[in-house]
């Protein structure tokens, strides 16, 4: 691993980032600083309120392509299938977290991964997370077209303490001097809580949500403290009530509940 603090450009980039604490360009500067040491394809800074809707603070694409429609779909309710969002809501500790740490056992076989994550977040993801007490959590996501290897994780672990400290200090400065709304907040309904509520029982709703997030029957049984056979019975019943027979159809219904046509991505 190279010495992170030997090159003049490193010192200059870090200084520029510190200068932007509490300012609009903070996130972009922090992302550019991280790119000096590690290649990644996209980055996303988010705030996830404990109660309320998430807000995108910075969207970065290394190729300059971007996809506003994909971001709009995520913010309209798809974020509720994001394992990092769930981890933030469950108050995972501050620091660097890998996808494998937070994702359900069959996440890479889920429709969310196959139809959204793999196309827009790409192959792998890590996040720096800062808990904001009762108000929510702050995250900085880095996405990559190939897996982050052990050397990459090691490098990110080295810089993690001061990255997290900068994020926390930036948010503190904003809370002391609130910035005007950016217009990026989306007023949307809680699609996950409404999805299927008219026809499914509370237990069936719970299982439908876990299916969408990528949990296997075994993992669902462990999480809910019931048998895998009971899970399978509930799955059959909820599929019958929704007149579907597969996870792809369940995912399509969820997209429709967000106002998105799955036939027109």
Language model segments and positions:
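Signal-transmission/dimerization alpha-helices at domain junctions
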Residues: 155-176, 217
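Recognition helix of helix-turn-helix DNA-binding domains
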Residues: 214-249
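Residue cluster at the C-terminal edge of the helix-turn-helix DNA-binding motif
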Residues: 240-245, 253, 257-261
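Regulatory input/activation interfaces that engage signals or partners
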Residues: 2-150, 161, 171
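Short alpha-helical "packing" element that flanks the helix-turn-helix/winged-helix DNA-binding module
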Residues: 204-211, 250
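Short helix-to-turn junction characteristic of helix-turn-helix DNA-binding domains
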Residues: 211-215, 254
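A cross-family signal for key residues in well-ordered alpha-helices
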Residues: 157, 209, 222, 240, ...
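Regulatory hinge/linker segments at domain boundaries
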Residues: 176-206, 263
